[in-house]
Structure formats: C-alpha cells, structure tokens
Amino acid sequence: MASLKKSLFLVLFLGLVSLSICEEKKRENEDDAEDENHEEESEEKRGLLDFAKHVIGIASKLGKRSEEKRYHPFGKRSEEKRYFPIPFGKRSEEKRYFPIPIGKRSEEKRYFPIPIGKKKKKK
C-alpha cells in the first residue's frame, strides 16, 4: 500500500509539474501575441498621429494663405510694392486710371456701336 501511495503521489506530482509548465508556455505565447498586437496598434496610432499632423499642417497653411489673400489679395510682393501698391510713373498710372483710349473716335466706337456718318447709297 505504501508503494501505491508513493507511485500515486509521484504520478500526481509529475502531472502537476507538466501542467504548470504547459500553462507557463501558454501564458508566454499569449503575452507575445498581446505584445505584437500592442505594437501593431501603436504603429497604427503613430500612423494616425502622423496623418493628423499632416492634415493640421495643411489646414494651417490654408489658413495662412487665406489670411494673406485677405490683406494682400494679389499675393506677396516685394516690400516696395507692398507699401506702394500704385505703380509709379506716368505711363503706368494712365493705364491704370484710363484703360480706354481717350480719343474722340475711340469714344464713338465705344458708346455708339452703329457707325455714325454718311450713309452709303445703294444703286
């Protein structure tokens, strides 16, 4: 009877040891799988963060651009043109303020599309 008890305890002990070893390996595998999932999630989060930074950068550039257009509707210029938007010089001012030639004939053409003058007689 004593030998049966010893053999039974031996089998029980070996079974428990092998069971604990298997459970330990299973936990390690689960931990590895969780680590891999965590790494993938962190990579996805990093990708989303990079994408979000990119989108925010574009939005800020568009905001700056609209603000520039608000104050400088023709884009950035050199310092002189920024503070003196009217071009200097007689010729450029004439072009700016008098885009239509100021001759009598040109005014007639502009305001009277029908030719004024003698009518040609048909025979």
UniProtKB/Swiss-Prot annotation:
Leucine amide sites (modified residues): L62
Top-level taxon in the UniProt lineage: Eukaryota
One record GO biological process: defense response to bacterium
Signal sequence, renumbered to the chain: 1-22
Record has Nucleotide-binding as a keyword: no
Propeptide positions: 23-46, 66-70, 78-82, 92-96, 106-110, 120-123
Modified residues (Phenylalanine amide): F74, F88
Listed GO CC annotations: extracellular region
Residue positions where Isoleucine amide is found in the record: I102, I116
Function: Fallaxidin-1.1 shows no antibacterial activity against Gram-positive or Gram-negative bacteria. Does not inhibit the formation of NO by neuronal nitric oxide synthase. Has no effect on splenocyte proliferation or smooth muscle contraction.
Family indicated by similarity: Belongs to the frog skin active peptide (FSAP) family. Brevinin subfamily.
Name of the molecule in the record: Preprofallaxidin-3
Lineage per the UniProt record: Eukaryota, Metazoa, Chordata, Craniata, Vertebrata
